[in-house]
Amino acid sequence: MSETIYSLFQQGRAQLKRGQAAQAIVSLEKAKRGEPEKASIREALGIAYFRSGRWEAAEAEFRKLLDLSPVNDYAHYALGRTLEKQGRSREANVHYKLAASLSPDSAQYRARIKEVDE
């Protein structure tokens, strides 16, 4: 990751920490243009879209993250949360179960499965 792209990525992460999701999207989209296959950028951008309530954009980022890293338990969980926000609970639960199988010690993942199953 070049210094400029890394700076944009760090700026976006800092904006997320400050609760500035919309500003983070701008920084992270610029970083993504420079490194479209960088999983860390895609993850942060997915989170920014999620926090902005932009479910389809978040879904696209988390799906791309899974293309880049299919065994990323958090990516499955985040995609599940995004799908659930769109009313797609059955599809979300598939990703929660995949996340839980990749990280069996996660109480958070198991809790989502239980809640969706009810």
Residue ranges and their predicted role:
Residues 17-30, 52-64, 86-98:
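Structural signature of tandem alpha-helical TPR/SEL1-like repeats
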Residues 84-108, 114, 118:
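TPR/TPR-like (Sel1-like) alpha-helical repeat modules
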Residues 1-7:
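TPR-adjacent "capping" and linker segments in tetratricopeptide-repeat scaffold/adaptor proteins
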